[in-house]
Amino acid sequence: MAADSREEKDGELNVLDDILTEVPEQDDELYNPESEQDKNEKKGSKRKSERMESTDTKRQKPSIHSRQLISKPLSSSVSNNKRIVSTKGKSVTEYKNEEYQRSERNKRLDADRKIRLSSSSSREPYKSQPEKTCLRKRDSERRAKSPTPDGSERIGLEVDRRASRSSQSSKEEVNSEDYGSDHETGSSGSSEQGNNTENEEEGGEEDVEEDEEVDEDAEDDEEVDEDAEEEEEEDEEEEEDEDEDEEEEEYEQDERDQKEEGNDYDTRSEASDSGSESVSFTDGSVRSGSGTDGSDEKKKERKRARGISPIVFDRSGSSASESYAGSEKKHEKLSSSVRAVRKDQTSKLKYVLQDARFFLIKSNNHENVSLAKAKGVWSTLPVNEKKLNLAFRSARSVILIFSVRESGKFQGFARLSSESHHGGSPIHWVLPAGMSAKMLGGVFKIDWICRRELPFTKSAHLTNPWNEHKPVKIGRDGQEIELECGTQLCLLFPPDESIDLYQLIHKMRHKRRMHSQPRSRGRPSRREPVRDVGRRRPEDYDIHNSRKKPRIDYPPEFHQRPGYVKDPRYQEVDSFTNLIPNRRFSGVRRDVFLNGSYNDYVREFHNMGPPPPWQGMPPYPGIEQPPHHPYYQHHAPPPQAHPPYSGHHPVPHEARYRDKRVHDYDMRVDDFLRRTQAVVSGRRSRPRERDRERERDRPRDNRRDRERDRGRDRERERERICDRDRDRGERGRYRR
């Protein structure tokens, strides 16, 4: 018996080898999804042909065993998805005839199946998942929606059978690795060989009965599968139409958003190319899995494919792809807010640049520009200093556009916030060789509008009409730029979010209010405009003029504050002081005070009349003041006791005479300085005056000497004539 069984096995192996050699060989490592799909179709057609052959045996011999008794062989046979054929007692020719007939039927059934699948697959060209794995999600939904329990049980059976079929592919790969072939015939042959050896050990009777039970189950499965496939095809067509409509709407919406935002992101074409998203629409990405793992991955991919945005960023890792939907919404919100902020910044910048004057500032190095950005100051040559000061007084805004020599870029632009001032803390500029800090002018305070750089290539289209229409990048330090050209150049700079333009606009308005403040026509306004430190006059910082400037003595300084209500007691004093331009030197003429000598000043001072009568603090209207003693007509009266409380606080004793004390002290100081200056100047001027007098007297002396000489000559001539006459008279006498 053992020898016979071995001979039969050898014969069967030879037949299987012949069948295997008829199939063309393929590379095991290559994976062809189309051949895999053809294999699955052939498997289904083989099951149908085998079912037709087994109908005769089922009618003759009914099933004896229940489904529970054959659960083990059923699982093995269904998992391999092969029809087990008992070859016991069959010759080789009969076996070949059966295989030939089976292959003919399979060809016809395959042709019908391909026609039916081509109609359904043409509607969805980009979906490449096989039919069995693609319908798992819909089975679970249909199970929940089934109205009757019979329908739910039927769908449950379908899901179980499909799960068993999905595990077939992994087992076929194992069998193909063992026997050296991945074709269907080879794997089926190897599985048939293993099953035949098991059936021979268990007995021929059990094999026939198990085959009949499997055939019955296969019939039920095929009927359920056909119904389910028809329903699923209809559902697929409906869902495909819905998915296509949704995708078209999403694509149109994304195109609109892209036009509005004007971004440079790559759109829909990257969705199928990016491997980092782990969303694959190829055939092999789903078929390579097995069982429930493949179904779970497929469900996640379906959800991700529906919710994915057509705008795809380059991301790596699955975590980025999972959190992409939330980040895309944040990006949309951020983009809208950024657009609003940038629009607001642009409008504010245009307001700042309106009616401004633009100057090109050339720096020798980057260090000075960095120092200017850090401290908000700038210094330039005296020639440019005068130009910028005049522009600051006349223009609404003065914009300085900075550029480092040979850098190929603009380093930003700023607005002048003050005129130049001298005498402040020194700024350690990095100066070129041969240049000292004394060669620079004053220090300007500037407010930076943009600290970011702009390459020259982006401003190549701008020319400066005020520099012979040369490119705006060309120019010397202090070159003025035309208004339109300067505005366009500043708008080309990238926006600097770190700058608050609102404060800059507030400073501009404050400066405009100060310059346009109305003044009274009669006399100059008593309220001095409040000058900040940067707007002080250059002479206030003069180092050489170390003497303190004479202070204008207003009665008290409270009225200089804004919102001050004038005290009625000062009306008379103010009217008196307005008549005298300078109270300290009211009796001395201005030309004598400025240009005269000390003697002239003393002479004028002594010729001055008596001081005006003392006028103390006049009381409030309606309050009488006791008359002064005649002795105190021209002098301050002694301090009096505080009057009783009369509705207001009395003026302190020191405040009454503070003005007088300051006035006397200033008088003494000025007199001393005038005397010393007069003495020094007198000493220097005396020899010069003597020389001048001598020079003046020299022509007079010459004239006098000449006249004297002439007079002497005339007298001598007269004497000679007289002497001659006398001599002649005497001679005539003697002759007589």
Swiss-Prot record:
Biased composition (Basic residues): 510-524
Compartments reported by the entry: Nucleus; Nucleus speckle
Keywords: Isopeptide bond, mRNA processing, mRNA splicing, Nucleus, Phosphoprotein, RNA-binding, Ubl conjugation
A Pfam family assignment: YTH
Any GO MF annotation of the entry: RNA binding
Residues that bear Phosphothreonine: T148
Residue sites binding RNA per the record: K362, S363, N364, W378, W429, D477
Positions of region (Disordered): 1-339, 510-564, 616-652, 678-736
Entry function: Regulator of alternative splicing that specifically recognizes and binds N6-methyladenosine (m6A)-containing RNAs. M6A is a modification present at internal sites of mRNAs and some non-coding RNAs and plays a role in the efficiency of mRNA splicing, processing and stability. Acts as a key regulator of exon-inclusion or exon-skipping during alternative splicing via interaction with mRNA splicing factors SRSF3 and SRSF10.
UniProt subunit comment: Interacts with SRSF1. Interacts with SRSF2. Interacts with SRSF3. Interacts with SRSF7. Interacts with SRSF10. Interacts with CPSF6. Interacts with KHDRBS1/SAM68.: Interacts with TRA2B. Interacts with KHDRBS3. Interacts with EMD. Interacts with RBMX. Interacts with ZCCHC8.
Designated name of the protein: YTH domain-containing protein 1
